[in-house]
Amino acid sequence: MAQPSYNIENVYRAISTINGYFSEEKQYGATIQRTDPIIHTYCHYGNTKGKCGNYFQMASSGVIHLLKKLKGMSGLECDKLAEYAILWLSYKLAIKPNNNGIDLNHFYTNYIIKNNDYNKKIKNDDSLTYKAIIDTKKDFMNIKEIYNFSYLFSILFYLYNVNNPNNLKCTNNSNYPENFANKFKELNEDSNINGNTSYRKLLSTLSDDYDNLKKIYVNNKSCNFPLLPQIEPKKSLAQNPAEISGRGFEQISGQTSEVISSSSSISTTLIPGLSVVSAIPVFLGIAYKTIYKKKIKKNNEENEN
């Protein structure tokens, strides 16, 4: 696979920086929110004064911060910017306590379209807006498969932010590289994914990022990085793409058990001091179970009525 023209480590370093601008977690029954004042920069909805009112508005602002930071890097085209932004966004939504079932499509409608900052022309590029960048991958917003990719992203995000890669004991942490490789193989063989050009490109991006990790962990003998299969285009055997893209968050809730099952292999053992990505081990295993249990319960109650 061709080596990307941009610095992958700098990309994940930038994502880590933006990720640290705000967080929310449950502690002893209380919701603790931590924010950096900079996160309020891009929160202009209607006639508001520009201060983010909730976690989702902060996530929206964070996406612009990330796009702005990545856009200054050499070799990153708009579609690649959108890929990383949406991967990070889906991760950030999934780890939020009490997400209330807000998915990417809902987020796009309420926190991107309605955020005035997305439609402002980007400095030194009068023909482009941040919304236009996101729209290059808008199809990711309404399809369940993006959450499978987010599982892969969460592992990469964790591994790229380990303070000392040579000290990470992969055998004590459910062997993240092997988990990545197994899930990658599964997605690569899924006709819903390998039959879609955009998804194959995203698999290629994650594959490049994974291969780059091998160089970082080359001296760590406990971390085995299996070879990833070649990404081969195949004819999709899935239903009409329009039907897939039209399915909402609740409609796909019953189909996520496989994702939840595979995610449970991520260990809850953390590297001391790794606060930036401390939520990653529960990324799917807890956050998704909580979200989807509520959704399934709601659906069952509606069906009974």
Regions found by a protein language model. Give the residues of each.
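N-terminal targeting/regulatory segments, especially signal peptides of secretory
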Residues: 1-255, 259
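C-terminal single-pass transmembrane alpha-helix
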Residues: 251-305
